[in-house]
């Protein structure tokens, strides 16, 4: 039995939920999100609490049970408070700029890298080497952050690259003569 799936999702004030079979639409002060789920699950709304239950004892239904509950919980949190990720750029001459709807990365390559910013993600840059991403959809935010990190992942010898703010990069010793 799923320990995560058993827990009900409490709906805070200011958040509205629309259910249509397996389609969930959630709107709140930060925006609106919708998702259609697959699998043998049932989603019901009762007394300001959202419940997810499996319809069968099949492996697929049990697998989707906890996953669907976590996704819906993240959607509720996203439209109420939003999500924030902080990326750090380490390296001499490594920096980033926002120009229009593009994020321009200068990462010691022969060319600058331009990444289109999705419409539902906001970018703040307090410094040239710090990128703050904000959005309502946790999945899209993490996906966009991984696209940015993939341009120059942190390397273990000098620590150069793009990483999450508190991410630990195991350092290696250089070669010895």
Curated annotation (Swiss-Prot):
Q: Which GO terms describe its cellular component?
A: ribonucleoprotein complex; ribosome
One Gene Ontology term from the biological process aspect of the record:
cytoplasmic translation
Q: Which domain of life is it from?
A: Bacteria
InterPro entries attached to this UniProt entry: Ribosomal_uL6-like, Ribosomal_uL6-like_a/b-dom_sf, Ribosomal_uL6_a/b-dom, Ribosomal_uL6_bac-type, Ribosomal_uL6_CS
Entry coiled-coil feature ranges: none
An example of a GO molecular function for this protein is: structural constituent of ribosome
Q: Which Pfam families match?
A: Ribosomal_L6 (PF00347)
The record's SUPFAM superfamilies line, in alphabetical order, gives: Ribosomal protein L6
Q: Which UniProt keywords apply?
A: Ribonucleoprotein, Ribosomal protein, RNA-binding, rRNA-binding
**What role does this protein play?**
This protein binds to the 23S rRNA, and is important in its secondary structure. It is located near the subunit interface in the base of the L7/L12 stalk, and near the tRNA binding site of the peptidyltransferase center.
Q: Family membership, please give it.
A: Belongs to the universal ribosomal protein uL6 family.
Assembly with partners or alone: Part of the 50S ribosomal subunit.
The name of this protein is: Large ribosomal subunit protein uL6
| Provenance organism | Rickettsia rickettsii (strain Sheila Smith)
UniProt gene name: rplF
